[in-house]
Each structure stands twice: as structure tokens, then as C-alpha cells.
Amino acid sequence: MCLTRFLACLGPTEVVKVAGVLLAAGSGSRFAGPSHKLLAGIGGEAVVTHAARSMVNSGLSGYLLVAGATELSSALTEFSELVIVENPESEHGIATTLSVAVDWGEAAGFDALIVGLADQPGVLSSSWRRFSNSYAPIAVSNYDG
């Protein structure tokens, strides 16, 4: 597989088909709450619901959530445009989850993927949009730094 197909570096005059991806396949083993961390409540909604809403409201061309260790679909019913794919090898680490996302992106004809983590509910839709307009082969976010 050629990963260069996913580089969003075509420049501002090119139309690039960009998908947002939330990685949500981990076991959340360090979280001490009564449920999986992605199902923990913030303001009456699951963490994963907040993260998915932000991504889906960003205006990208497509949206994927890669699940694995726990059932998340009940927290995502409002997002008809969100594709949910299971990573059957999630216990082998985040690289396998990213590989599932890249395979999906390639099969669906996307030019670039913006990858986020489903346990980061504070990422804004505007942040997803900014990344889609970066025209850089690799873009990394930072906070207060």
C-alpha cells in the first residue's frame, strides 16, 4: 500500500477528499471508572459522543470510527454519516487500529485522513477543519506550546 496517497499536500488549488477518523479501539485499561472510558459521561453524554459530534460537524468528506475493545454503537446512533469499523486485532495496539483506518480510507477513495482520538472530547470541529486545510504532508496539533 502506498501511504503517499493520503498526504494532504496537493496545495490550495487542488480538491482533496479528506476523511476524519476517530481511533476508539483501545481497552481503556488505565481508566478507573465504572465503565469503559469512552462511555463515561460528560454533560450527560458519553465521551465518544462528544468526540464524534465534533468530527462529524467539521464538514469533511467522510467520517470513520474504528472500534474494537468495547461496544460503542449505542452512543453513536445520532450520526448516520459515521462509518463504524471494528478492529479485530485491537489488543495488538494502536498501529493495528490505524492500519484499519488507512485500509478503509484507501478503499473509499479518500486522498487524506485526519486522525483523532475518541477520548479527546474537547477537540473542536474548527480544529478538524483547520487540519483539512493545512496542505501539509503531516500536520501535528499542539496545545499551549
Language-model region placement:
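N-proximal low-complexity "stem/linker" segments adjacent to membrane-targeting elements
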Residues: C2, F6-V21, G28
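Nucleotide and nucleotide-moiety/phosphate-recognizing core
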Residues: K17-G145
